[in-house]
Amino acid sequence: MAHPHLLAERISRLSSSLEKGLYERSHAIRLCLLAALSGESVFLLGPPGIAKSLIARRLKFAFQNARAFEYLMTRFSTPEEVFGPLSIQALKDEGRYERLTSGYLPEAEIVFLDEIWKAGPAILNTLLTAINERQFRNGAHIEKIPMRLLVAASNELPEADSSLEALYDRMLIRLWLDKVQDKANFRSMLTSQQDENDNPVPTSLQVTDEEYERWQKEIGEITLPDHVFELIFMLRQQLDKLPDAPYVSDRRWKKAIRLLQASAFFSGRSAVAPVDLILLKDCLWYDAQSLNLIQQQIDVLMTGHAWQQQGMLTRLGAIVQRHLQLQQQQSDKTALTVIRLGGIFSRRQQYQLPVNVTASTLTLLLQKPLKLHDMEVVHITFERSALEQWLSKGGEIRGKLNGIGFAQKLNLEVDSTQHLVVRDVSLQGSTLALPGSSAEGLPGEIKQQLEELESDWRKQHALFSEQQKCLFIPGDWLGRIEASLQDVGAQIRQAQQC
C-alpha cells in the first residue's frame, strides 16, 4: 500500500475537492466519503432543498468510472423503477422472470434514495438484501452488486415499531442536516456561479477499482487496542444503565467498529485510536432525544476517560491528600503557640500572636480533619485582626473553612499548652498549626509522585497530539479534548507549586 501519511493526505485532498461549492457541508461530505470508502450506508435527515441529493451526487466523483443511481420514492413507487423493468423478451421466449438492470440500482456504485420511508414492502425487502449481502436476486440467478455507498434521505424519521426499523438499523451513519446558518456562507451560496454537477475532482485523486478492493482488506487489518475496546465497553455499559438511551444492536456495534477501523486507516494509523470513537456520535442515535444523549455521553468519555483525564485527577487528589497528611503529621512541630499575657486581676486570660506571625491573613492546618458546618475541613483561614481581637478580648471568632466561602462561626479555644484547638459539634478537637515553611518545598515523596504524574500527563497529551490529525472528526470536539487535558495539566502544575 501507499505510505500511510501519503494516503491520508490524498484522502484529505479528495475530500476538499468534493466539498467545493458546498457550504457548511464539510462534515457530511467527509462522513459520506468515509462510508463510501468502507462500503457503508448513510441516512441524511433534514428539510427539502439543503443539498442532500447533491452530496450523494458528488460522491460519484470520488471514484473513477463510478455509476450513480438516484430515485425519489413515493407511495406508488414500484420495484421496476428501482431495480429495473422485467425483460419481456426473456419472459416471452424463455419463460424467465428477469430484470433489465442496466442504469438501475443493481449496477450502480453510488445510490441515492430520497424520501426513503415512502418505499413499499417489495422495495424494502429487496433493498435489505442488497445492503446486507451486496446481492440481488434476478430471476433464478443471484448477482453481486457493486454498490459502495447507499445514501438514503428523508425529512422525517421512521415511525417507531414500524416495518421500516430493520432498514433504518442498516443505516450506519446518521446525519441531521439544516439550512446554511453563517451569513457569509449564505451570501457565497447565493452568488456562486459554479455548476454543481461538474466534476470537481482531479483524476489523480479519484479512487480506482483496484485500490478500493485492496483497501477493503487492509481496513480489516487495523487493530483495536485493549484500551480503546475498554472505552467502547464503558460507553456501552453506561448506555445500558440510562433509561432513555436508544437500543443499539450488536450488528450496529460491529459495523461501527469497522467504520472506526476505516477512520484510522485513512488517517494513516495502524490501530483505532480514542479520537476515532467520536464518530460513534453519528452512529448510535435514533431520534432527537437520543442524539443529544449520545453526544453528552461521548463528550464525557472523550473529556474524562479517553486520555485518562479523570484517572489522573483522581491520582492528583490522592497525592494532595497525602501531602496534607504529611503536613498534619508535622503539625505538632509547627503548632501555633500563642503568648500568654500578664493579667493576674483579669477575669479572662489574654493572649497574643507570636511576633514572627505577621501576615494579614493566616491559614492554619487542622492536625486531623473535622466536619464543621457539614464540610470536611482540613484548614481554616483567619483574618489576623479578627484573631488578635479574639485572643485579647474573647467573644465570637469566624474563619473560612478550607479557605472558601463566607467566614463561619467557630468553637475555638486555647488549651493548656497554649495551642489553638477547634472543636466540632461533638466537641472533638483538632490542634491548629502553621503551614510548613515554603522554603522547605514539597516532601520528596510528594515531589516524586507529582513528577511521575506530570510525565504520564505529557505522554497522554503527546498521544492526543499525534492522533488528532483525523479528517473525519470536527474541530470543536478536538478543542474540547485539548481543553480537558490542559485543565489536568494546570492542576498538576498548581500542586507542584504548593
Swiss-Prot record:
Locations listed in the record: Cytoplasm
UniProt-listed SMART domains: AAA (SM00382)
Record EC number: 3.6.1.-
CDD domains: AAA
Matches recorded under Pfam families: AAA_lid_8 (PF17868), ATPase_RavA_C (PF12592), bpMoxR (PF20030), LARA_dom (PF20265)
The reaction(s) this protein catalyses: ATP + H2O = ADP + phosphate + H(+)
Any one GO cellular component localisation term in the record: cytoplasm
Activity control: ATPase activity is stimulated by ViaA.
InterPro entries, per the entry: AAA+_ATPase, ATPase_RavA, ATPase_RavA_C, MoxR, P-loop_NTPase, RavA-like_AAA_lid, RavA_ATPases, RavA_LARA_dom
Keywords: ATP-binding, Chaperone, Cytoplasm, Hydrolase, Nucleotide-binding
SUPFAM superfamilies hit by this protein: P-loop containing nucleoside triphosphate hydrolases
Entry GO MF terms: ATP binding; ATP hydrolysis activity
Positions of ADP binding: 23, 49-54, 196
Function as written in the Swiss-Prot or TrEMBL entry: Component of the RavA-ViaA chaperone complex, which may act on the membrane to optimize the function of some of the respiratory chains. RavA functions as an ATPase.
NCBIfam families documented for this protein: PRK13531.1 (NF010054)
PANTHER family: ATPASE RAVA
Self-association state and partner proteins as the record states: Homohexamer. Interacts with ViaA.
Family membership noted in the UniProt record: Belongs to the RavA family.
Name this polypeptide is given: Regulatory ATPase RavA
Organism annotation: Escherichia coli (strain SMS-3-5 / SECEC)
